[in-house]
């Protein structure tokens, strides 16, 4: 593999609970197994954890994640999802792990930007005019490096009512902005509890499997699949590869 290839793991939708128990939506052992598999692979430059860390808004759920993060040796970036208590998460998780919308992180040939789509108390996502302005300002002024955008809600329709109802509601405003910049190469999101990859114009949109459980693809009703995993991204100079890893 090329030396300048950036290797990323995406972990999403852990839904941890206050106790280390196997509830239907809080899978402590799943999360442990995912991080163990990532560590054993020994190949990643960065890990993005794309929201819904907690399922019950408890301090202990974030403490569980923190104990797992302490065992990792590569850079880790954590963002909130609609199930998270952002203030509590920011209190428990050290700043070095938190990805701020105010900053642009550069690594090799890419810039990485976090867009906060979370609306307090709501399932859907939304970007305010201020959020959109800040985001476009970053794209306009951060140079010519290729861009990777990280967020929780899906910013592109999946043609599935259950998730398109609760996606980033003003996704068209977001898409309008990124279409102005041909160096936006990758948008990583969570929320949808499965592995999706969609190409739109010059940009690849991609989600990882949930750590807790999957919602079966292409079904009109919610059908739970008791499997879990994470997703690898290989960012080469001229192209991007993805690889979904199923633990179970």
Swiss-Prot record:
Classification via CDD domains: MPP_GpdQ
Q: What is its EC number?
A: 3.1.4.-
Q: Does the keyword Hydrolase apply?
A: yes
Q: Where does Fe cation 1 bind?
A: 13, 15, 52, 193
Q: How is the cofactor bound?
A: Binds 2 Fe(2+) ions per subunit.
Q: Which UniProt keywords apply?
A: Hydrolase, Iron, Metal-binding, Nucleotide-binding, Plasmid
Residue positions annotated to bind AMP are 15, 52, 82-83, 193
**What InterPro entries does the record tag this protein with?**
Calcineurin-like_PHP_ApaH, CNP_phosphodiesterase-III, GpdQ/CpdA-like, Metallo-depent_PP-like
Molecular functions (GO terms): 3',5'-cyclic-AMP phosphodiesterase activity; metal ion binding; nucleotide binding
Residues engaged in binding Fe cation 2: 52, 82, 152, 191
Is Metal-binding one of the keywords UniProt gives this record?
Answer: yes
- One Pfam family named in its UniProt record: Metallophos
Q: Which cofactor does it need?
A: Fe(2+)
Q: Which family does it belong to?
A: Belongs to the cyclic nucleotide phosphodiesterase class-III family.
Q: What is this protein called?
A: Probable cyclic nucleotide phosphodiesterase CBUA0032
Taxonomic source organism: Coxiella burnetii (strain RSA 493 / Nine Mile phase I)
Q: What is the lineage of its organism?
A: Bacteria, Pseudomonadati, Pseudomonadota, Gammaproteobacteria, Legionellales
């Amino acid at each position: 593999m090329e030396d300048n290839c950036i290797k990323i793991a995406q972990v999403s939708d852990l839904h941890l609970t206050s106790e280390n128990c196997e509830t239907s939506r809080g899978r402590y052992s799943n999360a442990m197994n995912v991080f163990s598999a990532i560590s054993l692979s020994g190949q990643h430059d960065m890990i993005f954890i794309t929201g819904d860390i907690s399922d019950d808004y408890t301090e202990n759920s974030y403490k569980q994640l923190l104990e797992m993060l302490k065992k990792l040796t590569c850079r880790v970036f954590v963002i909130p999802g609609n199930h998270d208590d952002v203030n509590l998460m920011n209190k428990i998780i050290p700043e070095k792990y938190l990805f701020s919308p105010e900053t642009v992180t550069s690594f090799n040939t890419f810039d990485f930007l976090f867009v906060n789509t979370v609306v307090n108390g709501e399932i859907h996502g939304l970007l305010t005019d201020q959020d959109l302005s800040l985001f476009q300002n970053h794209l306009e002024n951060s140079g010519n490096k290729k861009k990777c955008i990280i967020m929780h809600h899906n910013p592109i329709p999946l043609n599935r009512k259950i998730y398109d109802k609760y996606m980033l509601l003003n996704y068209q405003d977001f898409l309008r902005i990124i279409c102005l910049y041909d160096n936006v190469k990758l948008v990583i999101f969570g929320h949808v509890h499965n592995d999706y990859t969609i190409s739109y114009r010059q940009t690849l949109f991609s989600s990882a499997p949930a750590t807790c459980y999957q919602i079966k693809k292409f079904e009109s009703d919610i059908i739970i699949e008791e499997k879990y995993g994470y997703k690898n991204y290989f960012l080469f100079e001229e192209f991007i590869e993805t690889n979904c890893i199923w633990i179970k």
